[in-house]
A protein has these predicted regions:
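Noncatalytic, helix-rich "gating/capping" subdomain that lines the substrate-entry/channel surface
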Residues: 1-245, 249
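Intrinsically disordered, low-complexity linker/terminal regions across diverse proteins
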Residues: 94, 118, 122-126, 135, ...
Length: 369
């Protein structure tokens, strides 16, 4: 029953001590595949639970008090909140012990392990994957093959799920819901959450005003829709065309440079030229804008309820567009108004959003040089 609950709330990212989702297969970049990877640590890194230097110990103690303070805000007594804290810390520390370090997670080969659903269910019988996925609207045919990032973590999690009490798992799920909902609830709840995450963890002095937080949330949930408005004002189609021409010229120049290199062998040159020719270039804004007509914001509902609606929309959209389907190379991983750029090695694409293509970085009237 608890895993049914994990699956239901997993749509919102609640209560599931592992990550799941669809993404490009790193060894077959044209297709999406189901991925499972370690997760479940509120503090993110295993060292916060296991290291004993003074700084880490102080953060861990502050985290324990944070848990108690939050549960009390939700109507639990001091004693009940402390009991919840102890159960949560026991479970998360057990997760930390089986988690890989950040350094280990950077090993691409070690974190790419292809499994069949049959193999997964045989190796991890206490992780009811089909049940978890069904609760999120993921059909079995889309998880017949998957990439398991950290098999040893899942083996440890499988044992934990077999030995942990219902009270421990329930407390962990309750905490995950409370913790992740905190920013969308009352000012009192938000203040306690800010005190730990922003002040204790990051050294911030004061919280942003509510209007800035709200603006940021609109950006996070409907960023591409805002980007469309931004581009209409600050990045016309003529600028997009100009930048695409400039990039094309750079590709031609780089092609000639590669051909002229005396230190490169002919097979190496061919591989370099093939990769350059295969670059997928994204400039300014998407050629096709996302359809957000099914995303409903209801002014009669609370901020939190509307946030859940947004998260559900994007979860369903990801499943619909990616489950069992080829990678959409036209999908953008940054909003047009973002002042940044990226290269995605899996899909061999470069992206320059309109936000970075402003003066002094880019001037459509300037000379190429």
């Amino acid at each position: 029953d608890l895993q049914k609950g994990e699956g239901k709330y997993g749509v919102f990212g609640y209560g599931v001590p592992m990550g799941m989702g669809f993404g490009a297969d790193e060894k077959n970049a044209k297709m999406n595949i189901f991925n499972i990877y370690q997760g479940g640590l509120t503090l993110g890194q295993r060292e916060y639970y296991l290291d004993n230097d003074q700084t880490t110990a102080d953060i861990r103690n502050a985290y324990k008090q944070f848990i108690v303070d939050m549960f009390k805000l939700f109507g639990f007594t001091e004693q009940q909140a402390q009991q919840k804290r102890d159960l949560i810390m026991r479970f998360e520390t057990a997760l930390a012990l089986i988690s890989k370090s950040q350094t280990e997670l950077r090993d691409v080969e070690a974190n790419y392990n292809k499994f069949t659903l049959k193999q997964f269910e045989a190796d991890y019988p206490n992780i009811h994957l089909q049940q978890l996925c069904a609760a999120q609207g993921i059909q079995p045919q889309y998880i017949q093959e998957m990439i398991v990032g950290q098999p040893a973590f899942l083996a440890g999690l499988d044992k934990l799920l077999a030995t942990q009490t219902a009270d421990e798992l329930r407390a962990y799920m309750e905490w995950d819901v409370i913790n992740q909902a905190a920013n969308y609830l009352s000012d009192d709840v938000r203040a306690v959450s800010f005190g730990f995450y922003s002040q204790t963890m990051r050294g911030a002095k004061e919280d942003q005003p509510r209007w800035k937080r709200a603006t940021s949330q609109v950006e996070g949930m409907m960023g591409e829709a805002l980007g469309r408005i931004y581009c209409e004002k600050y990045f016309p189609a003529s600028s997009k065309k100009r930048m695409e021409e400039l990039i094309g010229n750079l590709q031609v120049a780089l092609t000639e440079r590669i051909k002229a290199q005396t230190w490169m062998s002919e097979p190496t040159k061919k591989n370099a030229l093939d990769k350059l020719a295969a670059f997928y270039v994204k400039v300014g804004y998407p050629n096709t804008w996302k359809d957000l007509s099914a995303l409903t914001i209801d002014p009669q509902k609370s901020y939190y309820e509307n946030m859940l609606s947004c998260v559900t929309f994007w979860s369903n959209e990801a499943i619909e567009k990616k489950a069992g389907k080829p990678v959409d190379r036209d999908e953008w991983h940054m909003t047009p108004q973002t002042v940044n750029a990226y290269y995605n090695p899996t899909t061999n694409e470069i992206c320059f959003p309109a936000g970075i293509l402003q003066y002094p970085f880019f001037d459509p009237k300037a000379d190429d040089a």
